[in-house]
């Protein structure tokens, strides 16, 4: 069985919950990524921060990106999978919560991220279409 650990992007860097939105955006630009996990002072996952969050929930909401922090934009709910999760379990989490990336946890620590592209490489073509439709429904685009 293929697991999250098998297909994840390891070596993921967290943005600290006290880091500014500007610092997070600069890191995203430098590393050509669209999302970062938010970790607290306890090194545990507190949420995810996307480039879209910075624009919609930060800038468009009038927050100052030089003083507003990643932690302020952390979502109330944290969606993740265990490192031993199957592809189906990952699909279920991503589809249910309409997210394109899901952090991978092992022993309460962040060990990687699985993206929609990582999963798509392990699905038959007909399943890819269904998966993309499920995570890109109008509800996902409106939130």
From Swiss-Prot:
PROSITE patterns: CBS. One of its GO terms (molecular function) is metal ion binding. It comes from the Bacteria. Its main location: secreted. Residues 8-65, 73-131 form the CBS domain. GO terms for cellular component: cytosol; extracellular region; peptidoglycan-based cell wall; plasma membrane. Homodimer. Forms an SDS-resistant dimer that requires Cys-136 for SDS-resistance. This is Hypoxic response protein 1. It comes from Mycobacterium tuberculosis (strain ATCC 25618 / H37Rv). The gene is hrp1.
């Amino acid at each position: 069985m293929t697991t999250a650990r098998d297909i994840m992007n390891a070596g993921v860097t967290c943005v600290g919950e006290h880091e500014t939105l500007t610092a997070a955006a600069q890191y995203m630009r430098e590393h050509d990524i669209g999302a970062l996990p938010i970790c607290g002072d306890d090194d545990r996952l507190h949420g995810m921060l996307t480039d879209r969050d910075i624009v919609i929930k930060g800038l468009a909401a009038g927050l100052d990106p030089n003083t507003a922090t990643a932690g302020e934009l952390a979502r109330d709910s944290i969606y993740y999978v265990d490192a031993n999760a199957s592809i189906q379990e990952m699909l279920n989490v991503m589809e249910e919560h309409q997210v394109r990336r899901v952090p991978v946890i092992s022993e309460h620590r962040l060990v990687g991220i699985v993206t929609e592209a990582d999963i798509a490489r392990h699905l038959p073509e007909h399943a890819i279409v269904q998966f993309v439709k499920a995570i890109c429904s109008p509800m996902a685009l409106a939130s």
